[in-house]
């Protein structure tokens, strides 16, 4: 594996910029999921354990959704799969917003999970197909930053709309999905030609070449990256899901979680130019990941001791800076590990880390906060990140020894 430090601005194709902008629009309403558990408790009268179970059901449904997304991208094309996922999400979110009881909300949550991850593998594969290996870390970091900017707007929207009723958050989310679908439909190429995984280039002697199909499940490098990615995804999902519950447990307005996440995004955007400083741009992947997880550990440890909204701001800036250093690196490595034409399937398997985390996070958040309190949850998250600050660099070195994967810094 070769780590190439990008010391100058890296241009990415227009297709990547358009996709990032469309996903940012989609993300404007995406904060509704952070309030799914709270809404079921406050609006539909569910217990915290029941609401956590329904949220876990949503997360469980995202696991096959991610795999279906990878397969559909190969068969239907990337753009069609993205559109199917976005419209499916919008329909399910409107169902949650209008649900008269817990049973209907649970069914709609499961349907939302089945549609929720359909568009991720084709989105990530579209970036891999449109960029050179040296551009990928920057391209995936651009997508991450665009989603973060959308999250900042989502946090402000959640803080404003949430005071009028939690159901309205899901209506806004549905509208953002449809707006994103419109941009994708009008501005991105169809991608509905025969995918690269089905093309058979001629052999050097002019004859037909037999295409070797490589199963992602048999690649130990991918499985190791997925295991590490699951830990990061779990911590991130716990922040998203547990923050409103933590605020509520400490007597604060759970809708204020939107302001906290907006502060996290502001930190991510404002500090991003730091990545272009030669000293930072020259960091190896191992050092950047180790430092990133260490900063996340410090920030989440600060959450354990914060008891006011203002007290959460400094820890939020710290863990968000750590997230910035991690941004885009794992996706670039996974995309580079994939054989030609297999990027969607590799990224779909790696993306299962988010499905697993989405299942586990609501259950852990409700159980730990309900029985031990918010401080125990945030302390546990800090310990996980501290451990990953050692594990992730070791994993990166292992992949380096076995592969030649160019990974540029996310400058």
Per-range role (PLM):
Residues 1-13, 189-227:
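Juxtamembrane intracellular "pre-TM" segments in multi-pass secondary transporters
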Residues 9-59, 221-261:
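Helix-loop boundary and gating motifs at the non-cytosolic
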Residues 31, 59-67, 151-152, 265-273, ...:
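Residue-level signature of mid-helix packing/kink "hotspots" within the transmembrane helices
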Residues 45, 77, 98-103, 305-307:
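Helix-breaking motifs and short loop linkers at transmembrane-helix boundaries and internal kinks
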Residues 65-77, 271-284:
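Helix-to-loop junctions at the C-terminal end of transmembrane segments
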Residues 80-94, 287-301:
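Structural signature of the two symmetry-related core transmembrane helices
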Residues 108-147:
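Cytoplasmic helix-loop-helix junction between adjacent transmembrane helices
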Residues 176-197, 391-396:
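C-terminal membrane-cytosol helix-exit motif in multi-pass small-molecule transporters
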